[in-house]
Amino acid sequence: MHSNQVDGRELTLSFERWTFSFLLCLALPTCAARAELPTNAIPTLAALRSNLTVRVEHPRLAAAQLGVKIVSLDTGKTLFEHNAGKLLKPASNAKLYTGALALDRLGPQFRIRTSCYSAAKPDADGTLAGDLTVFGRGDFSMAARFNGGDHTKSLEPLVTALAAAGVKRITGDLIGDESFFHGPPFGSAWTWDDLNYYYGAEVSALTHEDNVVDLAFKPAAVLGQSVTLTTKPATQFLEFINRTTTVTNGGKRSLALHRPLAQSTVFLHGSLPADDKGWTDAMPVPRPAQWFVTQLRTALAQRGITIAGQLRTRDWLASEATRVDYSKWVEIAFTESRPMSELVAQMMKPSQNLYAQLLLLQVGARTHKPGQTTEEAGLAELQKFLAEAGVKRGTALLEEGSGLSRGCLLTPDASVQLLRHMEQHPAAATFRASLPIAGVDGTLKSRFAGTAAARTVLAKTGSLRYVNSLCGHVTTAAKERLVFSLMLNAYTGTTVSGREVIDELAVLLANFSGKSDGP
């Protein structure tokens, strides 16, 4: 049995006869009975500290590691700390650092440009002689998430731009150039068993629909027939070998998906009862640049724009002989992403790993040097930024931009200092607005219902197997503004889940009616 936790949505699927249960950072029901969250007002600082101490020293945490830091933005005083200098796995709390870096180095209004290059403009008849190259720079907003859930609109701006440039037919090839980023298509230390799932999608400067295909399974109308499968967006990029069966009512749902790494064939096994309401999943695609131009060709054809040649891609490993100096080419069309303020929010609220890594690379692409990967350059720039923010050296160690790597380490001290710094930053309001709001949206939409924390906690979640974290802002019952970092590692409890341990602490802060400089 292999189980893991990631921020996002709940998946339970069979894979090569193992069950992978992904219990996510949404507040979904747990196997154990839910713990009752605190409701009583806490009138004094002494009472708050007493309540917090009882919980952080609870015997159920004896084998775990818990780090806590709570500071008032209004007075600057530390209300409580426990193991605040200990390095712990942050999971997706790492995204706070990536989001802050992107806003600082690029600015809230920054947009990512995707360019269409050719040797010359199309002629009067709309014929583009030779190849058309789409040069990506990491725009991830070509996705249904940014278009009201409509997959058909994701590539529409790019197609419209080409049509507006007068392109009706292309005599050469359609080339997807993803060479803007230098390095492997995954974040450092992402593990192999993450790569077959949507949250481990390949990273590319040409990204379309989060580099995944959404899958919907329903039982067939006739017993014994294969389960029906539909995909969004519609595509032939993935080949599905369907070996599933529709079984009698009341049977057990047992579906297995397997796509060998770097291959585009997906094997489907198992069964679905005839009375099953259906099941959804998502499968990451291999070779995202190839996926991009494949889908673009289809979108162009629907607009009546034809391509006579083949589909090709170009990456950072291209030889000197095949590299292109685009300054000598004509940019016949381009699109720009949504502003960075929106990109950061769409990364933070649903806790999107691909977006986080792409934002780190976006920063790194502007500073990377020969012999250095774009990721290495981005991480180096992050360390410079953290030094400027007053974060002590050695207290924030990230290996990639999302927190999916278990090699990422942070201290509660570092995260609280980052939050305090961002409150003084020109992009303070943008950064704060990117955080999930308890009981309202993102990965906190279903958490803290009926408690004082609802709508008063704005925080980034983090969840991996045996790891739970929450870091952000809370407004107390006395309207004092606090920032906090709660990090729980190596916790295996089942009676009370790790998420519930963290939530109890956050609700105590929301219930605090005293003052940080009071008794």
Regions found by a protein language model. Give the residues of each.
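Short active-site loop at a secondary-structure junction
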Residues: 81-101
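N-terminal secretory signal peptides that target proteins for export/translocation
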Residues: 1-16
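Conserved serine DD-peptidase/penicillin-binding transpeptidase domain
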Residues: 36-58, 104-394, 478, 500-501, ...
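Bacterial N-terminal signal peptides
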Residues: 19-30
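Signal peptide processing junction and immediate N-terminal pro/mature segment
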Residues: 30-36
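A short, well-structured edge-of-sheet supersecondary motif
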Residues: 58-82, 312
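Small-residue-rich helix-loop
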Residues: 79-81, 350, 360-519
